Amino acid sequence: MTPHQRGDRREASRGVGRRAMDALYGIIRWAGGHVRGFHAAVGLYLTIGFGLALLGLGLFAALARLVGGGALHAADTRVLLWLHQHTSPVGDALALAGAALGSGTALWIALLGGSLYLARSRHFYSLALLWVALLGGRMLDRVLKLTFERPRPRLFGSEIELLGWQVEYPQSYSFPSGHALTSMVIYGTLAYLVARTEPTRRMRRWTLAGAALLILGIGLSRLYLAVHYPSDVLAGYLAGFAWATFSAYGIEAVRYFRGRRPAVALAEADLGAGMSPVREALREEPT
């Protein structure tokens, strides 16, 4: 493939992403033009949120069924073998960095830093969301691992050496990936909380894109280290997305029913005239 062809493919991929975002905002604008009344608008917002959570849960259930039936084992193994054949010092360094950023220590640092900021700025509902997402995500990871009891891949012995570091294989079950699930929950929730306070759509996109790259890198590091199958990582992403989305919109529902002023994570410019009853609710305020 020539450089020109690769450039065309990258441009086409970006075009697909832009069209998807434009379609999403088009749906929001259409809803804004047709939904009347504060309660109906907020109800639609919550319905969309819980619908996204159910979508993630449904995809996870479908993937779990394939894994349980052994349909993905051969493909999972081929991916790990291919990665093992294409290791490099740069790849080793990136894998170790990804493993460190997805470790419990890094996640707790991010959690405590975010908690301190939210507490000092008096965003208590956002603080509650962060902790609900973490505690529920950790519990969900343990329950799912014990439910499926999928053994870890053991393709290259009990440990692997990268840049002089001995990386031992975890002893817990493999499905889903805890690193993928908890990074999606913590970094995804933090990105959501930061992005909804950004003044422009471009800044929100950069914030969410940065979090997405970080979460993706953590998941890829688990494959590079061969401590998870690809389906484990994908399952972790889906379960983490479902739980983080459910938590976020659940907290918004509690906030609405207690204060009748939800912090809707949409920009005012993204809404049509029909959503005017909730325009004042779109600004993050101390609660």
Where are these regions (language model features)?
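N-terminal transmembrane-helix/juxtamembrane module of multi-pass inner/ER membrane proteins
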Residues: M1-I109, L146-F148, R152-V167, P286
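Interfacial segments of alpha-helical transmembrane regions
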Residues: Y45-G51, G114-L140, L208
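Alpha-helical transmembrane segments of multipass membrane proteins
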Residues: L52-L57, G137-D141, I218, W243-A248
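Membrane-water interface at transmembrane helix exits
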Residues: A61-R65, L80, D141-K145, E149, ...
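Alpha-helical transmembrane segments of multi-pass membrane proteins, especially transporters
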Residues: T77, L81, L129-L134, G236-Y237
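Hydrophobic alpha-helical transmembrane segments
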Residues: L101-A119, T182-L190, V194
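Hydrophobic alpha-helical transmembrane segments of integral membrane proteins
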Residues: Y125-F156, L213-P230
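Membrane-embedded catalytic cores of phosphoryl/pyrophosphoryl-handling enzymes
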Residues: S158-E285
